[in-house]
From Swiss-Prot:
Record InterPro entries: aa-tRNA-synth_I_CS (IPR001412), Arg-tRNA-ligase (IPR001278), Arg-tRNA-synth_N (IPR005148), Arg-tRNA-synth_N_sf (IPR036695), ArgRS_core (IPR035684), DALR_anticod-bd (IPR008909), Rossmann-like_a/b/a_fold (IPR014729), tRNAsynth_Ia_anticodon-bd (IPR009080)
Gene source species: Helicobacter pylori (strain P12)
Pfam family, one: DALR_1
Principal subcellular localization: cytoplasm
Reaction catalysis annotation: tRNA(Arg) + L-arginine + ATP = L-arginyl-tRNA(Arg) + AMP + diphosphate
UniProt-recorded name of the protein: Arginine--tRNA ligase
TM spans (from-to): none
PANTHER family with a match to the protein in the record: ARGININE--TRNA LIGASE, CYTOPLASMIC (PTHR11956:SF5), ARGINYL-TRNA SYNTHETASE (PTHR11956)
Quaternary organization: Monomer.
Length: 541
């Protein structure tokens, strides 16, 4: 609808037109500030230009039946859509059903490679991982809904010092808790009950003879064993959030291409040796300094592995590559982009979204850390506490790059302070009305909208505005817009519902048709957020 109006106005005015929502609903459904943009060109006051353009638009043949009014106001041009247009758009939307909102031209479709979570398989997923996980999953849902092709990948760091440290930690726990030996732990090791669990499970699963090998062999065996167990648990944690990946890429497998990649970097004059280390000339591409790829002991840095991985990704020729990283990886972006340029790739195809920190409270106190994982809050614990849908909604309710703090008890309340409950409640009210109604759904769907007041028209307009919310959420990577849209629409519906009886009016079928439209938009919005909307709310909800 937004796109259609914009297209009509641009055709009439032969200028690019920005369409906005007026701050005051009494000013109409849409507004444009185009008169301000043209003031310098025509050397006239925006007020005069707005008046002239409003007259031109309102009398043009292409707008007949489209607007009830086109009014100039303080330099803006405000538009109120006609009921006839809203009715036609409503009928089309209700016919589209679950596809309503997915309106994109095929020539704009993209191939998107989306990598997110990619947490080291050295421990359970904690709440910090969940924010990026939920965001990435919903971004993929929205992108696919808009007709884009998306591959979701989890990059598994299954080699290197962290994996060896995992094996060492399990081996020491095995000696202490299975063999009952006195053990001296190093300054840095993986703590938590999960390490002890793995050690005890290894005692049951692995051949006793394996524990008679030399210590380095034992650590290597336990590293692989523990890594596999943690990856299974990570997948279970993601499943609890409703998240499934198309692909899991192994760093160990990807790193087999290291020599070929380094050879290309050398040919590109991207490397040099200094202090017995191999450096990348990343400072040539806006990095703060050059970066070490190979250390003095000939082992590779994490960056070396990431360079090989990104080269493998870019060989697949996607339109766009999106990484979702923790905010602490901000400085990492320039060095990865530098490597892509050296390897002959277009680094502008890579977009990195940074997820800020999450702080959970319960009864206004910091959420209790998990004994099992040490100093972390586990995803599973919070999902068990409040449910996946509530957790997904709250994680998506603020921009990814802003800090998020919330009290989980808010998500258990059954009032308007709990946004997800309030939205579920709106949909529940609609379905309860439909059940009580003497009219069939088919009767309601076939009823023409001919007698709506301004408030009813505005509620219908809000329900029909889902496509713009979907498009903006994707284009701006602002998934909070979907949450805001659903909250606002639910709030407008509750105001409409509380204003008076719906079923006991002569135009009950028309009002129920609006309700069906509201329900469809809320359902589709929630589906894109990875949430199943409720049609009934019981006392236990």
């Amino acid at each position: 609808m937004h796109t259609l109006i914009k297209g009509v106005l641009e055709e009439i005015l032969e200028e690019e037109v920005i369409i906005e929502y007026p701050k005051d609903r009494e000013h109409g459904h849409y507004a444009t500030p185009i008169a301000f943009n043209l003031a310098k060109v025509f050397k006239k006051s925006p007020l005069v230009i707005a008046e002239e353009l409003a007259l031109k638009i309102s009398t043009h043949e292409k707008t007949q039946g489209l607007f009830d009014s086109v009014v100039a106001c303080k330099g803006y041009i405000n538009f109120t859509l006609s009921l006839d247009f809203l009715e036609r758009f409503t009928q089309k939307a209700l016919e589209l059903k679950e596809r309503f909102g997915s309106q994109i031209k095929s020539e704009r479709s993209q191939k998107i490679f989306l990598e997110f979570v990619s947490a080291n398989p050295t421990g359970p997923l904690h709440i910090g991982h969940a924010r990026g996980a939920v965001f990435g999953d919903s971004l993929a849902k929205i992108a696919r809904f808009l007709g884009h092709e998306v591959l979701c990948e989890y990059y598994v760091n299954d080699m290197g010092s962290q994996i060896r440290l995992l094996g060492l930690s399990v081996w020491l726990a095995y000696r202490e808790h299975v063999l009952k030996e006195s053990v001296t732990y190093p300054e840095v090791f993986y703590k938590g009950e999960y390490i002890i669990e793995i050690a005890k499970k290894a005692n049951n699963d692995l051949e006793p003879s394996l524990f008679k090998e030399n210590e380095e062999t034992i650590i290597e065996i336990l590293s692989g064993y523990a890594k596999d167990l943690m990856l299974l648990e990570i997948k279970d944690n993601l499943d609890a959030l409703g998240i499934h990946f198309d692909s899991y890429a192994s760093e160990k497998e990807v790193f087999k291409h290291k020599d070929a990649v380094f050879e290309r970097l050398e040919k590109a004059n991207a490397l040099y040796e200094k202090d017995s280390k191999i450096w990348l000339k990343s400072s040539l591409y806006q990095d703060e300094s050059d970066r070490v790829l190979i250390k003095e002991d000939k082992s590779c840095t994490y960056l070396a592995g990431d360079i090989v991985y990104h080269d493998e990704k870019f060989k697949q020729n996607y339109t766009k590559y999106i990484n979702i990283w923790g905010a602490d990886h901000h400085g990492y972006i320039a060095r990865v982009k530098a490597s892509l340029e050296f390897l002959g790739h277009d680094s502008n195809k890579l977009e990195v979204l940074l997820a800020q920190m999450v702080r959970l409270l319960k009864d206004n106190e910091p959420y209790k850390m998990s004994k099992r994982a040490g100093n972390f809050i586990l995803i599973k614990d919070v999902v068990d506490d409040v449910g996946k849908d509530a957790l997904r909604f709250i994680f998506l309710s603020k921009r990814l790059d802003t800090h998020l703090e919330f009290d989980v008890n808010t998500l258990k309340k059954q009032d308007s302070s709990n946004p997800i409950y309030y939205i579920h409640y709106a949909n529940s009210r609609i379905h309860t009305m439909l059940e009580k109604s003497p009219f069939s759904k088919e009767e309601v769907l076939q009823t023409p909208l001919t007698n709506l007041n301004a408030e009813e028209k505005y509620l219908l307009f809000s329900a029909l505005s889902l496509p713009k919310a979907v498009e903006s959420s994707f284009e701006e990577y602002g998934l909070q817009k979907m949450c805001e849209y659903a909250k606002t629409l639910a709030s407008e519906f509750h105001r409409f519902y509380n204003a008076g009886k719906i079923l006991d009016t002569p135009k009950a079928k028309e009002l129920l048709k609006i309700c069906l439209m509201v329900s469809l938009s809320l359902t589709n919005a929630f589906k894109l957020l990875g949430i199943e909307i409720k049609t009934k709310i019981s006392a236990k909800d």
